[in-house]
Amino acid sequence: MANLRKTHPLLKIANDALVDLPAPSNISVWWNFGSLLGLCLAAQILTGLFLAMHYTSDIATAFSSVAHICRDVNYGWLIRNMHANGASFFFICIYLHIGRGLYYGSYLYKETWNIGVILLLLTMMTAFVGYVLPWGQMSFWGATVITNLLSAVPYIGNSLVQWIWGGFSVDNATLTRFFAFHFLLPFIIAAATMVHLIFLHETGSNNPTGLNSDADKISFHPYFSYKDLLGFAILLIALISLALFSPNLLEDPDNFTPANPLVTPPHIKPEWYFLFAYAILRSIPNKLGGVLALLFSILVLMVVPILHTSKQRGLTFRPITQFLFWLLVADVAILTWIGGMPVEHPFVIIGQIASFLYFFLFLVLAPLSGWLENKILEWY
């Protein structure tokens, strides 16, 4: 008799994805981040659910309800710290996952890659509306500044902003709908993740060589299930350590002050994981231009597969493009630093140079270096 896990209508779906899935034998720890993102999403949904049980989405009580969660709810402080810092770990894993995809040419699985970019946008939206919920100073002013960017849309801009606000300013209606969005979006992310996996399992995983690995596959369980569990343990230990020892390390001090529409904080800035995009937004002196640059800083990932010129898939054997990849990593680090700095000399010009380089690397230098490496291969 055939094994139940291979015949049962539900179990065989799980079996084909988690047990008998053929995986390349040589995928490295860089292939762990997909499952770590799944763990992050599960942790965020779980902690978020418990926070939502005690949170009130009303401007009169939102700030107090978060304080109440941290002071009076059993282990509420832990749940809140895990949720807030879990978002940071979520984005660390996302950026490493995208970096892996760029380095090893995983973007050539176009459907998987494009769903991944959509997942990134959904996660950024979720994190943004979530940051507004505690209704501190930075929550309020962050919401005001970022939603205001939509006024740059020609003709319908102002109507669009007021429609999203539900009034003439960021107010009670805004907070209530942002809570609704923040509750709903993670489940949409979970659904999109399933689509991401469906497309991935159509082709199978890429591997560090970028070569076809059909001749050398091993089963996902036990090899990679245990490898993933090791990753889970490391991530959870890191997250719990941050949440217990230094929970406010990545938090903005302004957000410990209740929202006040009459007092603008001296430096309005988003959470650290959005600073690179914020720096690109600020580096263009025109409002609409800045908004488009902000949007394209993420959407540029979608054109990466189209601009792939190399005969080789990954960067394993491509030293010139390798150098450009690490230049991009350094550039994003510089943009992250600039995004948290005041708008004054020399930060403005550094941000503008870094923003230009960001797009130049993706759109010009990477395709050129791929072409050049092809030529070098022909010469030798």
Curated annotation (Swiss-Prot):
Gene Ontology process terms (BP): mitochondrial electron transport, ubiquinol to cytochrome c
Regions that span the bilayer: 33-53, 77-98, 113-133, 178-198, 226-246, 288-308, 320-340, 347-367
Pfam families: Cytochrom_B_C (PF00032), Cytochrome_B (PF00033)
Disulfide cross-links: none
Needed cofactors: heme b
Subcellular locations according to the entry: Mitochondrion inner membrane
Membrane topology value: Multi-pass membrane protein
Note on how the cofactor is bound: Binds 2 heme b groups non-covalently.
Note: Heme 1 (or BL or b562) is low-potential and absorbs at about 562 nm, and heme 2 (or BH or b566) is high-potential and absorbs at about 566 nm.
Protein name from the UniProt record: Cytochrome b
Organism listed in the record: Tropheus moorii (Blunthead cichlid)
